[in-house]
């Protein structure tokens, strides 16, 4: 079997859904070079929320948390209308083909993060229902899976930890039962607790879902369909003259993802590497193109400089309040606060009396800064980006610094990291 994952940009409108159908049909009729037969009864389609739906649903959560119920309802109606328009363009009947939820699944007595998971998960539930019904009406053998009932997690809201053993058993049983349809459509990004609460796996977690399903079901391959030709050495929206990296090793992919490369979710590689399952990244608009392949046989190390931008960063610097500064103890205190406040660290630098950390600038940062101030003198700079250059040279580094305000830099033999003011 194979696993195909489609991101929100790929299914942002009716034309995207039609192209997904085309790719699915190609897969079902494809004479695979690996198994030398078409994929029969063996295609798992993992789908994210459509377009910018996740961002819109996050806005609903924020408005409700701020007590702005009317604005939240207006935003919610806009989200439903967006999906209804796509359904109608695809010839589907809202309300009969697909049941729409009128009420926002919000409980003011629950913590923010728990409400977040109940509301934001609606994006994937909507998109997959639309796609499953569309494929079914086009004559394909299709089944829709409700992943919150199948992918078991704990209740770490927004960063749920998957119960591998239980999830594997349940998913394998569902997949291996007699007369299962040829195509299964499942949500990425979301799972569920033992008591039926929906959870999310972290931003961009649909890739991780696809990798887990590939591992559980012993897939011959997992393919992520993107709006780019494959894995590039830079974001084409930010850097001109990008180069396709056709083949790379699991290790290189892990390093790129943890540096902030958004082409692959950081957790994606491990489940695939454990079973030596190749991961393909292919262009959604050109399904017959080769794209990129990540595997144990990948070519490495990467022989072109790779530019990775991580936006919306804040640089927090902590200075000792007195001279009784012990680095190890201070780091322990700092990372305890960072962990308790769910901050994502992208860079660390220390000196004799200061420690600086660069983190994603989320709503949790102000509380963390206040807690850090109880132990340290704290300063910070926001509106920053982190540029990581793998495979750098003095010439490349000098060019990267031109015209930019550098707040902090780190350089090793082959990697440079620059914290810069956002332009």
Where are these regions (language model features)?
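Nucleotide/pyrophosphate-binding catalytic subdomain
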Residues: 1-264, 269, 421
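Electropositive, surface-exposed helix/loop patches at the edges of structured domains
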Residues: 177-193, 256-280, 317-331, 381-402
